[in-house]
Amino acid sequence: MRDERELDWREHQRHEFPLPSPDLAPYVARYWIVHWSYDRPYRQLIVPYPNVHLAFRGGRATVSGVSSRHVFQELDGDGRVFGVAFRPGVFRAFLGAPVRSITDRTVPSMFPDVPEPSVPAVEEVLRSCLPEPDPAAVLAAGVVDRIVARPEITRVSALAEETGRGPRQLQRLFAEHVGIGPKWVIRRYRLHEVTQRMAAGARVDWAALAADLGYADQAHFVRDFTAMFGETPTGYAARYHQEISRQRSADAPGST
């Protein structure tokens, strides 16, 4: 059961997404800061991306590997969390182990503590821990960037042809440096594009999309979509349209 407050999250949360300094941009995709205020516990659904995250919350720092499916985070009372989203592919040197070893896990931070996290304070710590350049990490990050930039890449075979590396080479590279397989990353970004189209009011041919993404049937596609987004494609689309209608009503003349 989805929390009825989900559509009203802006009344309870404030989000900031500062960009990293240029010297840290090869490692950090973005920072994220969330402030919240709830009078009773709220289960926040988190949709997965292929990023490793460093989070500072309540005096505790943790590192979360890539999640293979959506997860929930409980927010209660008034609080704040400061997070670092690392670029996909670059975290292995910080971790000192294959990134797949922390997939679907949250572990204590291996970085020095930051009692009062802010962009300058966290960047000072990150600079003190920068690893030596790793050509394999650069390669992995570049392959993920190519997936993001090329919507026509819908299968691992197409990615292999695009990069000149075999599917098994890509599997090993992603397990070591990204933490999850190339098929998952491809499907994740293609599904993100679908949700963007839904947000714009477009209708989606689910059966055709499932075939384009290499699913044997629509049922398997629905299963994976639900694992990522916490609801079926049709349920997700209906909720999006409900939110759009609410926003239009709120913005209409005489609505306030």
PLM segments and residue spans:
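Alpha-helical bundle regulatory/interaction domains
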Residues: 1-167, 177-182, 196-200, 205-216, ...
